[in-house]
């Protein structure tokens, strides 16, 4: 209902009813009973899966996530009162098209307010992930968090550690990718959740940068500006790359002829790995994010690269994400896109066969003409590929002649 009233496309539809789960499964024989204790049934309709839940009230939450007791109800008001925020507690009567608002959710939608239902501390202590959900909804919708709700989040922020890393990971990913990422991280900071979850990001605050390259200010501001420029529906890897690419700056900060962060990309890889591992991101996500962090400074040298180095650079896996990270890096600092335009132009100019040409020689070819297997063979093949990428050689005969001239005793 929330998204429909805001004029946004609704991603899914949930149904609440006084019917018990066994009645629902009788009506829909193919339905899947996924939460008998909670009266939740999944019903397939065409290509959609709809969650059908029985009205219920709940007892205390001893574990901070699951209610100790569930009572099935016939009164929708009791069901609504257990929900997290007023804007998520609006119901639509399908027979009359009447919006049923029992907690002031429609007024909060109109005012742009995220407000916990009832006593905020109790709502958050029922499920501590709601601390982050409040931030996500405020960021994505461009809403403010109601003062009493905000105060409760700040007071309970240390309890976010009671939530599993996997659930925190999913919420961070959604904050980064569903819109309003910059606002989301400002709110994580303001509520104290950033301090609890990502102290490495918090350390960016106040770390100044050379003004000739970063007139925007410190590393924190730079990162927020990049998050603000993220395209719609970015991949999690790109969004995480933006968030983490400069985590190596605080520990490498020094003042010499100017402010410098020598080796910050390498330091950032180590820090990013610690964060992503702590939050239990999958290995393929970790690998790509670390690749983005490790290579983000290479763009500054792209116009000076020789042909072989540039072509190898351009053929990095998922290079589009590297290129987009660089564009955002520029937009979040001095705004100069000349290097991005150069690299993008080269990418469009060079056909795939020039970036990844067919190999002229293999190790077997070299063994066949008398070379012995060993570490030097890799050096030989790299030299051949360099010359091929540079356009110096074009045939197997030329490649073998090059090897003989350089490596034959």
Q: Could you describe each region identified by the protein language model?
A:
Residues 1-409:
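Catalytic cores of the polymerase beta-like nucleotidyltransferase superfamily
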């Amino acid at each position: 209902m929330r998204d429909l009233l805001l004029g946004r496309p609704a991603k899914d539809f949930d149904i609440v009813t006084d019917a018990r789960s066994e009645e629902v499964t009788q009506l829909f024989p193919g339905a899947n009973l996924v939460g008998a204790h909670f009266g939740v049934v999944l019903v397939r309709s065409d290509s959609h899966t709809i969650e059908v839940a029985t009205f219920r009230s709940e007892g205390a939450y001893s574990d901070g996530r699951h209610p100790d007791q569930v009572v099935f109800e016939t009164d929708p008001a009791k069901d609504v009162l257990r929900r997290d925020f007023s804007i998520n507690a609006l119901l639509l009567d399908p027979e009359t098209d009447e919006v049923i608002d029992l907690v002031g959710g429609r007024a909060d939608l109109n005012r742009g307010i995220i407000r916990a239902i009832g006593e905020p501390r109790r709502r958050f202590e029922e499920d501590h992930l709601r601390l982050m959900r409040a931030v996500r909804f405020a960021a994505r919708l461009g809403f403010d968090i109601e003062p009493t709700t905000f105060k409760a989040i700040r007071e309970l922020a240390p309890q976010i550690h009671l939530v599993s890393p996997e659930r925190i990971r999913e919420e961070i990913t959604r904050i980064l990718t569903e819109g309003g990422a910059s606002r989301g991280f400002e709110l994580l900071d303001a509520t104290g959740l950033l301090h609890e979850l990502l102290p490495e990001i918090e350390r960016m605050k106040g770390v100044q940068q050379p003004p000739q390259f970063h007139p925007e200010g410190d590393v924190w501001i730079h990162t927020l500006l990049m998050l603000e420029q993220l395209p719609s529906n970015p991949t999690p890897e790109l969004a995480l790359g933006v968030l983490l690419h400069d985590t190596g700056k605080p520990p490498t900060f020094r003042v010499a002829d100017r402010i410098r962060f020598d080796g910050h990309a390498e330091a950032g890889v180590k820090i990013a790995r610690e964060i992503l591992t702590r939050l239990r991101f999958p290995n393929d996500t970790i690998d790509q994010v670390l690749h983005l962090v490790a290579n983000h400074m290479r763009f500054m040298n792209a116009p000076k690269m020789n042909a072989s180095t540039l072509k190898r650079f351009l053929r990095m896996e998922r290079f589009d994400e590297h290129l987009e990270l660089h564009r955002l890096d520029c937009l979040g600092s001095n705004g100069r896109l000349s290097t991005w335009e150069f690299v993008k132009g080269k990418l469009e100019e060079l056909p795939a066969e020039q970036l990844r040409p067919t190999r002229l020689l293999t190790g077997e070819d070299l063994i066949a003409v008398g070379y012995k297997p060993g570490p030097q063979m890799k050096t030989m093949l790299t030299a051949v590929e360099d010359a091929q990428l540079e356009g110096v050689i074009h045939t197997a005969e030329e490649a073998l002649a090059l090897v003989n001239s350089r490596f034959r005793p």
